[in-house]
Amino acid sequence: MGRRPKKRGRDIHGVFLLDKPPGMSSNDIMQKVKRLFQANKAGHTGALDPLATGMLPICLGEATKFSQFLLDADKRYLVTAKLGERTDTSDAEGQLVQTRAVNVNLTEILTALPHFRGDLMQVPTMFSALKHQGKPLYEYARAGVTVQRQARPITIFELKFIDYNAPFLTLEVHCSKGTYIRTLIDDLGEHLGCGAHVVMLRRTAVSDYPAEKMLTWEALQQLAESADLSRLDALLLPTDSAVSKLPPLVLNEQQTKAVGFGQRIRFNNEENIYGQVRLFSAENLFLGVAEINKDNVIRPTRMVNRNNGTE
């Protein structure tokens, strides 16, 4: 008996900004969004903890080729920590491992914050998806095994005080890729001498995506039930929005054909643009991403497939 052919989704392309609900993993909610859009392909751009809410860009179709750019992008968070309690996961979903008195005033908090701004070295939490010998760290942690982790460079561009109503402290964080907010709060709690863990975490921004374009899962479901797929498709941001921080370069017809075949081309680099660029045709169609070297040669690195209706 032959295998049943795999059902193929729609060739739909773009980025959907989901306001992630609490209590679900990023992968689970991404799969639900994929099914709702009936998309052939989907990928998210950096997991949020199940406890967390907020901006989760979901790439559909050809946009998945550029998800790494959003993984590497700066992010902003609003976080509330509970002082005086430390957990094994550094958030409210973990087991309480230590309780201490909270003898911390606002002045001490404001004095501590500058220590956590700028370029830092952060040791990732054991409860993370980072791999060790092919296995996520959280699997070791759940088995009671602690793995030696190397500190990684991160940057906290902004750490802003919002509110302190003891024992709850609310901060706004603007950080580089790879920053664990749970670890930041745990480290701050140890610095203050009382311990702390995350009780609320909301991602408010990824790269320069507008927060007002986010839609909740409930709103998306309601729209899907009451309208056809074209209404859902209208919610998608263009594929090239994932690389909007790269300078644009418009190619002529001959150059467009060449890069479409993956060929390198030399050009008259009047604007002295070097490094990564996003390429467009003369008709303003997004072609993909390329690298321009010092010899003014364009080398295509990640191109969209223009045979499947990519916008």
From Swiss-Prot:
Enzyme Commission number: 5.4.99.25
Official protein name in the record: tRNA pseudouridine synthase B
GO term, biological process aspect, one: tRNA pseudouridine synthesis
Source organism: Actinobacillus succinogenes (strain ATCC 55618 / DSM 22257 / CCUG 43843 / 130Z)
GO MF term set: RNA binding; tRNA pseudouridine(55) synthase activity
Top-level EC class: isomerase
Keywords: Isomerase, tRNA processing
Family in the record: Belongs to the pseudouridine synthase TruB family. Type 1 subfamily.
Pfam families tied to this protein: TruB-C_2 (PF09157), TruB_C_2 (PF16198), TruB_N (PF01509)
Organism lineage string: Bacteria, Pseudomonadati, Pseudomonadota, Gammaproteobacteria, Pasteurellales
Active-site annotation: 49 (nucleophile)
Listed HAMAP family: TruB_bact
Catalytic activity: uridine(55) in tRNA = pseudouridine(55) in tRNA
NCBIfam families: TruB
Function: Responsible for synthesis of pseudouridine from uracil-55 in the psi GC loop of transfer RNAs.
